[in-house]
Amino acid sequence: CQVDHHFRCDGDPAGIQRRVTLSEEGMLFMGQIDSETQWVESFHALSGHTERLESNPADPASLSALLATGHDSFDFFTQSPEIGRTRYVGEDSLTGRTVVIDDVTLDETRYSLTAFSPAGVELWRAKGHEFISRDWRMFLSGKGVVTTPTDRFEKNDEPVEFIFPGEAGFLSPKPKHGCGALMSQAPELQEYSNDHI
């Protein structure tokens, strides 16, 4: 039960896209990606921490590489004033499957992602499938499993409906689908659903 608002700001550098994710209770996440879908900056509302991409990643995420070859790996650090550095290592691959959701054509991807502390201790890992829009140059959430040292949960954030400017419900802060269900995972685990943008 959430709604994602995707938008651009005139004052941002070329290629920057922004996203705000809202639940029934309010904002969950706010983030920026660049034209290659690198995580430029993320704000996690439930925990109150911000992350920014460190410069010169060992293996930058590249949507262009994924589209050209069907596979892309990544290995980068983020820096946070609240929680320090975090290393993210993973990969995306095209499954070859194309889906149409609410008249929007998307390519399905498969992903795996692990987050590590600066000392190399695993913090959490996630795997599952997502979607990409070639036209919009962005990832859209899908189904996955997140595992931490103490917990594990499945998530399903697949898109249900796309609402464009001029259509009823555009810019509404209220989610429309899947609401009212009991959320069993802890609040901090819910945020992992928003990390892989």
Residue ranges and their predicted role:
Residues 21-27, 80-81, 135, 143-148:
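Short, flexible beta-strand-to-coil junctions
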